[in-house]
């Protein structure tokens, strides 16, 4: 059986768009199960929206596909959700791959807190295009030109993004999580980020490297948070994921020595 891979996107591009290059380059090496974020199911986020809604939805998707255990891939906000899933349901994962998690679940370090409190302050009171422009600008390294917004009026789906991203930020802040849970992971982790993203991405990579027992961190050159998906899921990146998936499958099939 091929590796079964569940993919969770971030707060901007839907899963089909975000992971199209990954799926195309992987070819027949794996079966992919795309899961869009629950926060966008309705025109506006539910008042009680929480990280638990997203985590439980991954369970429902996996159960509906008959996946007892699987590989999980997350990007940005989907990276936070994937990390939360990995910490609370480690027995279901064979491997975890994340590109630039929006943040790491759990109590923030001083460096993290300074960045996120600054981000929230800059976004406060903004709506629509102003919200999105500020959100994008804050995710890249100083001096890096962020991509321009799409031409024309936003589609109905994209109009959901500013309130949806704001709801995700609130949910991430409210989510209670102990980072020590990561130490229980018995699966490999591949964490990637771009050298043109805000330096806090390197901070998060370093934090995760302190907790996960088996983690590989890769910094990609010439890449930031908002480059086109094909610049993130390059042949090099996809080959690394396929190698990890197959190695993890073999390890998972071996009898436990514990």
What residues fall within each predicted segment?
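Conserved HGGG/HGGXW glycine-rich cap/lid loop of the alpha/beta-hydrolase fold
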Residues: 1-44
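Active-site loop/oxyanion-hole signature of alpha/beta-hydrolase fold enzymes
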Residues: 24, 33-71, 237
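Gly/Ala-rich beta-loop-alpha elbow adjacent to hydrolase catalytic centers
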Residues: 74-78, 82
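Flexible "cap/lid" loop of the alpha/beta hydrolase fold
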Residues: 87, 94-124
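Conserved alpha/beta-hydrolase catalytic His-Asp/Glu region
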Residues: 127-166
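Short beta-strand/loop motif that positions the catalytic acidic residue
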Residues: 185, 191-193
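Conserved alpha/beta-hydrolase "acid-adjacent" motif
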Residues: 198-204
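Catalytic histidine-centered segment of alpha/beta-hydrolase-like enzymes
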Residues: 219-235
């Amino acid at each position: 059986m091929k590796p079964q891979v569940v993919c969770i996107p971030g707060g901007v591009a839907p899963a089909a768009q975000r992971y199209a290059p990954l799926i195309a380059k992987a070819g027949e090496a794996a079966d992919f199960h795309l899961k869009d974020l629950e926060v966008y199911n309705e025109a506006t986020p539910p008042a009680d929206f929480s990280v638990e809604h997203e985590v439980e939805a991954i369970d429902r998707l996996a159960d509906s596909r008959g996946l007892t255990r699987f590989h999980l891939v997350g990007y940005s906000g989907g990276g936070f959700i994937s990390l939360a899933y990995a910490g609370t349901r480690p027995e279901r994962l064979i491997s975890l791959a994340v590109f630039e998690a929006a943040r790491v679940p759990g109590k923030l370090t001083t460096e993290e807190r300074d960045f996120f409190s600054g981000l929230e302050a800059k976004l406060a009171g903004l709506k629509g295009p102003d919200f999105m422009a500020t959100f994008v600008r804050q995710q890249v390294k100083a001096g890096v030109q962020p991509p321009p917004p799409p031409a024309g009026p936003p589609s109905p789906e994209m109009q959901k993004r500013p309130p949806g991203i704001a709801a995700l930020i609130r949910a991430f802040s409210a989510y209670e999580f102990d980072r020590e849970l990561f130490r229980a992971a018995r699966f490999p982790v591949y964490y990637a980020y771009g050298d043109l993203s805000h330096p806090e991405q390197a901070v998060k990579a370093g934090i995760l490297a302190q907790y996960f027992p088996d983690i590989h961190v890769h910094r990609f050159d010439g890449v930031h948070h908002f480059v086109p998906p094909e610049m993130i899921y390059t042949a090099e990146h996809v080959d690394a994921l396929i190698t990890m998936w197959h190695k993890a499958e073999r390890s998972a099939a071996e009898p436990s020595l514990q």
